């Protein structure tokens, strides 16, 4: 009769714990820097560069208007280069014209890490981000902007027993 190693027993216990009480996306809650449609492009680029933010939630007052990605910023910059200079005048709301639509989903804080992971895997659209709110609705305050890389990093560092 085979006796399981201590490592095998530890791994089984870990997997059981993850199945019984899975981690939720609430672990990603952090301060989210939001921008208003009327903010200057120059100021937004400065802040996003300093804070290394690649996904920018945009609001019109208190109403969510969209998510701008670094891809849209690059497209905007390409269209505004003249004589090897880029004029940074304008508002961040103009960036939405360079952004594809529906590249994000709102999700509730109660969603498990693996449900969020599955969303990235099964969504018919290529998601750029999951926007975390208390109940997963657009009307609520965004508590986190979760990328595919964020989930992958979390799973790899916290759930390595599941994948090894």
Per-region residue spans from a language model:
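Short loop/turn microsegments at loop-to-beta-strand junctions
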Residues: 53-54, 128-132
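A structural micro-motif recognizing beta-strand termini
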Residues: 36-39, 108-112, 135
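Core beta-strand residues in small-molecule sensory/regulatory alpha/beta domains
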Residues: 59, 133-137
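Glycine-rich acetyl-CoA-binding "A-motif" of GNAT/NAT acetyltransferases
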Residues: 64-67, 139-145
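Tandem CBS (Bateman) regulatory domains
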Residues: 8-31, 69-128, 145-164
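Acidic (E/D-rich), amphipathic helical modules within compact regulatory domains
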Residues: 34-39, 43-84
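Charged interaction/catalytic cores of defense and host-pathogen modules
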Residues: 1-2
């Amino acid at each position: 009769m085979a006796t399981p190693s201590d490592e095998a027993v530890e791994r089984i216990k870990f997997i059981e714990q993850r199945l019984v009480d899975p981690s939720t996306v609430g672990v990603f809650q952090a301060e989210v820097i939001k921008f208003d449609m009327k903010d200057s492009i120059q100021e937004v680029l400065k802040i996003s560069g300093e804070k290394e933010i690649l996904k920018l939630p945009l609001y019109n007052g208190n109403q969510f208007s969209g998510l701008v990605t670094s891809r849209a910023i690059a497209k905007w910059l390409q269209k505004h280069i003249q004589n090897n200079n880029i004029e940074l005048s304008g508002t961040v709301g103009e960036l939405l014209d360079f952004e594809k639509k529906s590249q994000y989903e709102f999700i509730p804080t109660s969603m498990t890490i693996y449900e969020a992971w599955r969303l990235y895997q099964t969504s018919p659209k290529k998601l750029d981000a999951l926007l975390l709110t208390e109940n997963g609705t657009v009307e609520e305050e965004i508590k986190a902007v979760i990328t595919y890389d964020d989930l992958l990093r979390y799973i790899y560092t916290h759930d390595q027993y599941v994948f090894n």
